[in-house]
Amino acid sequence: MSDATLAADPPRLYLASASPRRRELLLQIGLTHTVLRVPAPPGEDEPQHPGEAACDYVRRTARDKAERGQAWLHSQQLPDLPLLAADTTVIVDGIVLGKPADRADALRMLAALSGREHEVHTAVALCHQGRLREDVSITRVRMRALEQAELQRYCDSGEPYGKAGAYGIQGLAGAFVSHIAGSYTGVMGLPLYETAALLRSAGIAVP
């Protein structure tokens, strides 16, 4: 199916995310969609609760995004289509790494990942016909040891910003990754296997 055909097809679901990577991944499997730009509440990047496991944290944040999107959808009286939300976080030494606040924060995160293995958790939540379905992808990623000069150049590229763990595996940082066990698309931000399975379980055909 060509991009032109996809563009002509009516949207089949809402994507409650501004991430261009998630949009590209949905189009990759032929799922036309509308990006739902839900107004973000104060403190959107909610911290992990005390004692909350990383997997539970990322599930909760994806679920919250989906439920908030569904409420906004109804408040705007928009057509009722399935709504998909996702959240990604990086975990090293049991510590959740979200999106870096600034260059110093990005350098700190990248230094923590250098030469080590970490986990990337991406949770997906689907609201459809009054029911919420969810799943989570957990992928182990190993980065080679990185020189300080490499980290500085990477930050100069602007790529670390807006990404959990301060890197994007589909970009320049792909050259940093020596091994991956799990879902490549999950590390990008939307695990396609789990996403397609959720959609099928809700009776939504996936090409």
UniProtKB/Swiss-Prot annotation:
Keywords: Cytoplasm, Hydrolase, Nucleotide metabolism. GO terms for biological process: nucleotide metabolic process. It is an enzyme of class 3 (hydrolase). GO terms for cellular component: cytoplasm. It is found in: Cytoplasm. Gene3D superfamilies: 3.90.950.10. It catalyses: dTTP + H2O = dTMP + diphosphate + H(+); UTP + H2O = UMP + diphosphate + H(+). The keyword Endoplasmic reticulum does not apply. GO terms for molecular function: dTTP diphosphatase activity; UTP diphosphatase activity. The record marks 21, 88, 170 as: Important for substrate specificity. Its EC number is 3.6.1.9. The active site is at residue 87. Coiled coil: none annotated. InterPro entries: ITPase-like_fam, Maf-like. Its cofactor is a divalent metal cation. Nucleoside triphosphate pyrophosphatase that hydrolyzes dTTP and UTP. May have a dual role in cell division arrest and in preventing the incorporation of modified nucleotides into cellular nucleic acids. HAMAP family: Maf. Belongs to the Maf family. YhdE subfamily. PANTHER family: BIFUNCTIONAL DTTP/UTP PYROPHOSPHATASE/METHYLTRANSFERASE PROTEIN-RELATED, BIFUNCTIONAL DTTP_UTP PYROPHOSPHATASE_METHYLTRANSFERASE PROTEIN-RELATED. NCBIfam families: maf. This is dTTP/UTP pyrophosphatase.
